[in-house]
Amino acid sequence: MELGKAKLLRTGLNTLHQAIHPVHGIAWTDGKQVCLTSLFSVEGEPKFGDTNVIGQFEHVLGLFWGPLCCSGSPALLAVQHKKHVTVWQLQLSALEQNKLLCTQTCEMSEPFPLLSQGCVWHPKMDVLAILTKRDASVLFSVRVDNRRVKADIKGSGLIHCACWTKDGTRLVVAIGSALHSYTWNDIQKSLVPCSFCPIFDVGGYICAIESTDEAQVAVATELPLDKICGLNAGMAFDLPNESEGLCRPSAALTVDTDYYLDRRRSCDSERSGHASSGPIDLTNLLAKHRKSDPSPLIHLRKRDNLTGTGQDSSHLILVTYERKVTTTRKVSIPGILVPDIIAFDPNGHTVAVASNTCNMILVYCITDSSMPNVQQIQLQKNERPKGVCFFTNKMLLFMIGRQKSNDPAFLPSSNTDKYILRLTAKELVFDEESTTKSESPSQHHGIRRHSENFTKEDRLSIKDLILPGGSVIVSPSSRRKLIEEVRSSDLSPVASSADFSDRASSASSVTLENYDMDHITRMASLAVAGQASRDSSRPCSPRYETSEKLYSDATPPKNSKEKNLEQLTQNMERIFTRFAEVQQCLSEIREFTQNGKKIACSYPSAYEPQYVHITCQKQLSENVYTDERRPLLLCGGRICLRVVQELFGLTVVEMMHGPMWITLVADADGFVPLTFKHKDELTIRSARRKSPARPPSGADDFPPESPKSPSMEK
């Protein structure tokens, strides 16, 4: 479902976290307006309904639904602005049908800007945690006032994110690489540090956190570039002493030399076919450059086991708070440098990990196995996940933002960016489906595999994550990689394949891939029947073995052929249908030219009615607006004005046309003297309004006279 243009935060955002209400639907924003989109399930699949705009502010950075703790009580919606939060109470009117009543119950201002996920609701009570970079506070009476209690933050680090445990007794705040735990006492309304472990360091800078169990949280840590670049930096760049021989064994900033040389020979032999996507280390290149020079200015030496510390990858870590704090799981996140999105499904015990700056989503499942597996969901090259959540245990719901092409030579100057948003769902492949696909790799296009050797210490010290299907991927090896550069590689000789992939429809832009651990296979097929290879716009999967080679198969798999032929057949059928419509129009024109009048039009079939969507903007109060959307049947491409007036209770009707509003009139037959096409979107309002109306939903620019909440003046 297309949502339109929006201006959202660039990083650290999960727009679908606490954003779905069972009655009111999905709450989302375009940066200024508060929108509700109805959501319902049909045979386990999500279906999206109408979208209504219920409010407008100067800035909206996030929307969060409160918990369903009291049956019959109005829903609570927290609206996050730049430096303050407003809490609204929403309920359907008992007097008027389809009328939503919105009342502000609480407002809280902060001296510092709020975090990207600056509001976190308690799972069982009307208690809201508000987060800035310096402070964490809890509002415990949001339906009445803004009374709150602050957490006693120890240390000088910056807060990045926080979450409540599922039992609601603990607020866990992520500061740098440490988890600060606070116990919440609802009777005393107090927030005190944990008695047995107030601070727990996970060993990496925390990007996202989510509760997974009654006393367990999952955290995602980013790739520690500062530690990698700073670790042994002095040793790596020190000039050798006279007492030191150049042959003295020392550490290096690179991966295994044999591994790099094999990769280099492989790249040299296959350079004409494609570019290498393996790890290339600058220090190794410099050390082997200019062999004729016996004394380079900087002596670069090899480190033997830098990666043995496990600091060469971003990680997903499960932390349990019981009588002591323990790390129960730890697994690497391949290909995602800054994993700032986590979504957890408590039914299937499945975790989805993504990043606002990477076009793929990884899905893990929590089990006690030493051979975990991950499913990868790949987006288009210019798409980014802005929100991820589970609709069911096998269905993921995404809010995807498509970016405009930015010049990579210039760093972004703002923490926000413009996107074109859409909602989509993707079913995960479990059990038999996953097993069947992993048995025959040659019959599936785009399946990627990678493996790595595991030391005994790694197997004993790290428990990993696995999909329910049983196919798995292990944690990072201690000796095979340092930093893996994820890049695009154009394997197909078809020059326009990347462009064609970018122009693919949004329905087919999300692809699902499986990783398993037998051996490494990478396939790329040529474009068949108008469908180009998607590998040209995808990041390459990591490489860890010295014997791995990249190759392309010019013959597409059978399943891919059948799928492409079926898609081509559907496209041809649509073209033939358009030709039939053109022929009918030409026949009518010819008849009109010969007889001087148009032939009597035949009504369309009841199975294919011709209609338009009419959205009526109504003002509920001074600052609250609502949209009522109805489909209306067309009569030969025309609309009866009297029906529109009675349907929406209007006397004089205005219709939006570009930047202006046009008052509608009727001809002698009572129809608006305009013709409309099937499924046109029309926006109307009453011409007799007392105050300036807000702009229509989805408008790019908001005029200065647009009404704003009084709280926005602060």
From Swiss-Prot:
* Lineage of the species this protein comes from: Eukaryota, Metazoa, Chordata, Craniata, Vertebrata
Q: Name one GO molecular function term.
A: kinase binding
Ordered alphabetically, the record's keywords are:
Coiled coil, Repeat, WD repeat
Descriptive protein name: WD repeat and coiled-coil-containing protein
Tell me the segments the record calls region Disordered.
Answer: 432-454, 531-564, 685-714
Tell me which domain of life the UniProt entry assigns to the organism this sequence originates from.
Eukaryota
Output the InterPro entries linked to this UniProt entry. WDCP
Q: Which residues form a coiled coil?
A: 567-595
WD repeat ranges per the UniProt record? 55-98, 154-194
User: One Pfam match, by short name?
Assistant: WDCP
